[in-house]
Amino acid sequence: MVISRAGGILPDFFMVFCQETAPDRVNRGTSRYRRFFLFMVQFIQHINRETKDMTELQRRLFELQDKKYQAFHSKLIPNIEPAHVIGIRTPVLRNFAKAFAKEDGAEAFLQELPHTYYEENNLHMMLIGGIRDYAQCLYEVKRMLPYVDNWATCDFPVPKCFAKHKEELLPEIRTFLASGETYTIRYGIGLLMRLYLDADFKPEYPAMVAAVTSEEYYVNMMIAWYFATALAKQWETCIPYIEERRLSPWVHRKTIQKAVESYRITDEQKVYLKTFR
């Protein structure tokens, strides 16, 4: 775990050691071993500084680190500092969450906001998703949303218990949409997209989404995603939003783009949508 946490530290220290000792053709032996000893002392001291403030949970999470994935995934969430991304693949973190949810420390972890690492936030969302009691689950979601700071954490699957309480959830969604907070708004639109586009659909729902005005990229992208999905599921009700250009120009174009890319939109519908670009 320590080596994983240190990452690129060892090569830096090792290169310094090599540069200082390799040219030493005369004073080999004692001098060289002394320098190696000092190098190891420096290295251990650095590791101690790096890890002394880590919680036990954070240490366990770093044991799951995949450095190549960390480098790749950090590019997908550019507003998060790479130093705050451990680099844990979602299936691995999901398996960890299932086991961790049964531990005594899980409940305490939910109270420890804000978190330091991106994966801690994702773990938090996974734990919330498993809460069966609707009132408790909603309470935890509302506690967490102010700390959500990226699209990936925001877009985690909706808690299962929400599907059984759609009428009760609607006023909360309206509050989310009116919050003025980027990821709270995005989360609310995501709920409407995932829970209210099938049997429980009502024309008022796309109207709620269309009424959201924002300059935030991640809000507007979610609005476009919502309408592209809505066109696939509720074409007759939602196509007027495109025909009458009720959406902002950017969202209008992005909605058409995403709908045309969707396998759920027919070829005939795609041809029609392209006429409104």
Where are these regions (language model features)?
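Positively charged N-terminal leader segments that act as targeting/secretion signals
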Residues: 1-17, 21-37
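Alpha-helical scaffold domains
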Residues: 41-277
